[in-house]
């Protein structure tokens, strides 16, 4: 991955639920957005009031859970990702 995230931004590859057994196909606007993904890049963190960087608690490879409408979708090298702040992540697998 040749994409360097800045500040407390996290780049996530969404892990989508597979419901292919249903004969009903919903339009994209009606589908539930993924809320779980794999972290593929993280920024260094944010600066505190003393000018020191607060390190990230999320690292590359973590599987995380996030708010349904968190972040922004981007496309990089013909693949879709979600960029969000670390504070939008609500949990990670242990």
UniProtKB/Swiss-Prot annotation:
Pfam families per record: Cpn10 (PF00166)
GO biological process terms, semicolon-separated: chaperone cofactor-dependent protein refolding
Keywords tagged on the record: Chaperone, Cytoplasm, Stress response
Subcellular location(s) per record: Cytoplasm
Disulphide bridges, residue numbers: none
Main location: cytoplasm
Presence of the UniProt keyword ATP-binding in the record: no
An MF annotation (GO) of this entry: metal ion binding
One of the record's GO cellular component terms: cytoplasm
SMART domains: Cpn10
SUPFAM superfamilies: GroES-like
Subunit structure: Heptamer of 7 subunits arranged in a ring. Interacts with the chaperonin GroEL.
Summary of the function given for this chain in its UniProt record: Together with the chaperonin GroEL, plays an essential role in assisting protein folding. The GroEL-GroES system forms a nano-cage that allows encapsulation of the non-native substrate proteins and provides a physical environment optimized to promote and accelerate protein folding. GroES binds to the apical surface of the GroEL ring, thereby capping the opening of the GroEL channel.
Family: Belongs to the GroES chaperonin family.
Protein name: Co-chaperonin GroES
Organism of this sequence: Ehrlichia chaffeensis
Encoding gene (name): groES
